[in-house]
Amino acid sequence: MELVVNGHNVFLVILITFLCSVILVPVTMKVAIHVRAMDYPDGVRKFQKKPMPRLGGIAIFLSFMVGYMLFARESTMMLSILMASFLLVLVGFVDSINPVKAKYQLLTHFIAAFTVSVYGGLVLNNVSILGLNLTFPYPLNYLITIIFLIAFINMVNL
């Protein structure tokens, strides 16, 4: 489904998604505490003072889905993004309860990026950096797109 974009719809999508998040985040926090899906401080990578619930991504994903279902029309790109997002949320949920090894997380990121690039049609054919225009030939353009998407997924996950 393709999102129908105009000023009114964009405002409504943002408002509804935000309101859903405001409602769902506290609920998922309580569920996370109940199932002990907590992020405990370790002094190495996690410097928070007290344990934090880890299931907030589910609330954000569900909020996104509500906005999408209310205002979207069918498109291969959006379907590929939804499939990839669902896969990432699913593995993130499992990781919140029982840690998933980094190599399996990276494999998941690859599958998600591959889905969006190959199935969804998101491909970087050229990039301009500091006035330099780089053009990527096939199949290098797909490889660069997948690497870029994996890097982006990892930046967001930090």
Please name every model-derived segment:
Residues 2-158:
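"…together with the soluble PPM/PP2C metallo-phosphatase catalytic core" -> "…together
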